[in-house]
Amino acid sequence: MRASIWGTGSYLPKKVLTNADLEKMVETSDEWISTRTGIKERRIASAEEFSSFMGAKAAEKAIEAAKISKSQIDCIVFATAAPDYIFPSSAALAQAYLGIKEVPAFDCLVACTGFLYGLSIAKAYVEAGMYQCVLVIAADKLSSFVNYEDRNTCVLFGDGGSACVVGPSRPGSLKISKVNLGADGKQGDLLRLPAGGSRCPASQDTIQNQQHFITMEGKEVFKHAVRRMEFAAKTCITEAGLQEEDIDWLVPHQANERIIDAIAKRFAVEDSRVFKTLAKYGNTAASSVGIALDELLRTHDIHSKERLLLVAFGGGLSWGAVILQQM
């Protein structure tokens, strides 16, 4: 039995934060942001739009697209870098919001690679026969952890949610053909949220030192991102018994246009076949690839046997690649 994606969904908050808005907040410009990142605007969640809420909203659309009832879902995996709480899990909160029966529900914290890790978990469960219908959710309200006085990070991130339903392959679904994942904790300090966990719990000092905001070593992250995603993608292609020219669409993590372009060049993918949502939504962390995949499927006809290559990179450091094929 092979696992496949039955349906996808996404959710974006209504509030738009443009580059022009950021010009009024920090020392930056639309030209500076656009040329360095490719981002024009991003969505910012309201006080009521937390990660579990956005994920649940995306899940409703995925369930509808999959043409199933909520009662068929027998496991929930929630990928996030910005959970509502350390506990209870955002998966359990989304489960309650959706009114889904008391099935296993847990979080997966792999930052921006989360959607791919979630797909991998769902694939393994379905193909092992452990569960028949797994709901994978990825959502992040990263604006809660962005320092809007730091122009190097505040221009990058936006909020959003994505989801998909994974089950045994059926006609019209997207078969999850091959997965390759990796992580390197030795490089963890390059991209992290320093305080708030058990190693560095919240205190007056951590607040005064602004340690509850995202920190990033941009140049080092860029180098690792391109190299690691290229490795994961090429390994995936080789293990699937394919050639690079067999890939019809590239759906990358929407982090930075320079990173996306660097990956596309390494695979000689035509620009029209590299799907981007970056300019509209910025980097939406774990939900990024899922949002892009959902938008691609809703705006383009993916023909039978076409293959999609998903690639992502995030904190951990973590990375991954997944090959999907239209059934």
From Swiss-Prot:
The lineage of its organism: Bacteria, Pseudomonadati, Chlamydiota, Chlamydiia, Chlamydiales. Its EC number is 2.3.1.180. The active site is at C112, H253, N283. GO terms for biological process: fatty acid biosynthetic process; secondary metabolite biosynthetic process. Pathway: Lipid metabolism; fatty acid biosynthesis. The keyword Lipid biosynthesis applies. GO terms for cellular component: cytoplasm. Pfam families: ACP_syn_III, ACP_syn_III_C. The last Arg residue of the ACP-binding site is essential for the weak association between ACP/AcpP and FabH. It is found in: Cytoplasm. Keywords: Acyltransferase, Cytoplasm, Fatty acid biosynthesis, Fatty acid metabolism, Lipid biosynthesis, Lipid metabolism, Multifunctional enzyme, Transferase. Disulfide bonds: none annotated. Gene3D superfamilies: 3.40.47.10. Belongs to the thiolase-like superfamily. FabH family. It comes from the Bacteria. GO terms for molecular function: 3-oxoacyl-[acyl-carrier-protein] synthase activity; beta-ketoacyl-acyl-carrier-protein synthase III activity. The gene is fabH. The keyword GTP-binding does not apply. It catalyses: malonyl-[ACP] + acetyl-CoA + H(+) = 3-oxobutanoyl-[ACP] + CO2 + CoA. This is Beta-ketoacyl-[acyl-carrier-protein] synthase III. Residues 254-258 are annotated as: ACP-binding. Homodimer. Catalyzes the condensation reaction of fatty acid synthesis by the addition to an acyl acceptor of two carbons from malonyl-ACP. Catalyzes the first condensation reaction which initiates fatty acid synthesis and may therefore play a role in governing the total rate of fatty acid production. Possesses both acetoacetyl-ACP synthase and acetyl transacylase activities. Its substrate specificity determines the biosynthesis of branched-chain and/or straight-chain of fatty acids.
